[in-house]
Amino acid sequence: MTGHPGPATGADRLRSAALLTATAAQVLVPVVGPLLGQRPVGEVSKETPSIVTPPDWAFGVWGPIFAGSAATAVVQALPGHRTEPASREAGWWLAAAATGNAAWEFVAQSGRYRATPPILWGIVAAAGAAHAALQRTAPTATARLATGSNGMLLGWTALAAAINTADVLLATLSIAPDSRRGRAVSLGLVGGAAAGVTAVVAASRRGAAAVASTTSWGLSTLAATTARTSVRATAWAGVSGVAGGLLARVAKTRRTRDLFG
């Protein structure tokens, strides 16, 4: 990795520290919270009925997302990389996304699950802004790492925000998820999220496959485990749409590695 010439400023060091702190927080909150009396996120979320939540094992996707985020934070904090365009252009957005993740985990674990949708959409907005910023930077190794790890976060949280919003909205309005209206809301939001991700994937010069991978993972695990035909059809249609967006991007991409970061 080649650093950007020029000495690091106080702003560079502050940004790097913020990113490291936020990245550590998003990993530690789910571990420390239950030790301090909070309930695990999975336990709290199951109290809100849903027909569109992927199976528990699908959430293992957070492993590679967190690993990529940690690697990005460490690399951007190194003296030779604090001043890289990728660090300066996207660092604060990456820190905002990680902070949002930690906040979402804390609020959910404290039992206020219905307050979480706005936080999730904030994460999506921050990750989306970072993704857009990274499209404009030179494709250095540092930039590729950030683009890939953030792309996975963007793809997963875009779907998660739609599912979370549907579940909380139906619970707030006392609408049964498996009713006609409930299915319309849930499947409409999931389909809308898939369409939005498809558009992002098709338009991304770099990191398209990273974004597509986690959305497709969530949708395909949902489709493979649900007993509801309408949910299965919507999920597979979403996977097909995202795959179509990725194929459109592949046709325009000269370097295969650009698809990943």
Walk through the language-model features, giving the residues of each:
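Short amphipathic, positively biased membrane-proximal segments
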Residues: 1-261
